[in-house]
Amino acid sequence: MSPVQQAVVERVERLTWERIAPRASQYDAAGANPVDSWRDLWADGFLAGAIPRAYGGLGLDMATYIAVIRAIARGCASTAMTVHMHSTVMRFIDAVGTAEQKRHYFDEVVRHGKLFGSWGSEPAVSLSRTLLMETVIRRDPSGYVIDGVKHFCTMALGASYYMVWCALEGGTDMAKALQLALVPADAPGIATDGKWDTLGMRATFSPSVTFTGVRAAADGLLGDPGAAIQVGVIESFALGYAAVYLGIAESALAFALDYAKKRVVKPENIAVAADPTVQRHIGELAAQLDAAALVLADSAARWDGADLTELGPLANRAKYLTTEVGLHVTSKVIQVVGGRGAYKEFPAERAFRDLRTCTLMPPTVDRMLEAIGKSALGLDTAMFNVSGRRASRP
């Protein structure tokens, strides 16, 4: 990293440890949106990390952005994930939005600290299998109307705008019918069931939401139909997930290292760190995390200059490795620490819960391995199967 990039990462690391990490357990217990942490990140410019400098944002390159998300995740996984989802919406606006949409929505973030959610998941569809939307957007004389149900609606009741993934009425080929719509959170007809009592990632607050006759202005439609899967942004969801996974696992290992150095056992009166068995476990975990970190950093460094067909493989390999390594590390840390690792006053159990939960986000391990294998064989590099056709690229 250049000195400028490193300074950005160090700034968010300080903010994370001073302000964000101390709140993580409270937001986790409450299952509530981390609004104070969002406010702090906005004040320091990080809600505008993916917004171009011309619009007042930080304009971070992908390598720096991924390092920022990873750093936040070490302190609070839910805060990191919500900021990543919001930032990806900013990338969609930058990629397919009109000049007026960019001016208006970027200003909402830069000047007013507004957050944007991205809602694509649906109850009857597995995005790891097929990219298909059953939520319908239809035109009427006064604009557009949205009807449907969305699952895992991250930042519900917290974000100011929701980017809703819809299908044009009557459309089944998502390459032609997929339509993104930016909807204000206070639009009439939006109802949440309020249910989000999960194993982990509790502060992402992601209940189900029903849209009943929700009106969307014509200037709220983002991009042409099908554009969302043609501009190289959808793949960046998975790259950011990988950064969150790695940050969570790193926080778990950091706790184990601190514990092993400080915990003294009798009758030898020596630190746990002196035990060769513990040393071997720590060595295994450290080596695995280093390997996953290198792959993630390489994918991020290559991202901005990559061809669209390269983005899926870059994201898949990073997400796959950080998933497998992260799950192993967060489980093994509790084994190394022992009973204290199960106490909620310590961060290991939250890391275990958060990692196990957020690694369920698509694409799944099996789908990633399939895609990585096809790429290695010179076959299809698509990250998602698009309903209505087998796309050569997402």
Describe each PLM feature range.
Residues V149-A191:
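A short core secondary-structure module
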Residues H151-A156, F237-Y241, C358-M361:
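Glycine-rich phosphate/pyrophosphate-binding beta-alpha loops
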Residues W196-L289:
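Glycine-rich beta->alpha junctions and the first turn(s) of the following alpha-helix
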Residues G339-P394:
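Glycine-rich phosphate/cofactor-binding loops in nucleotide/flavin-utilizing enzymes
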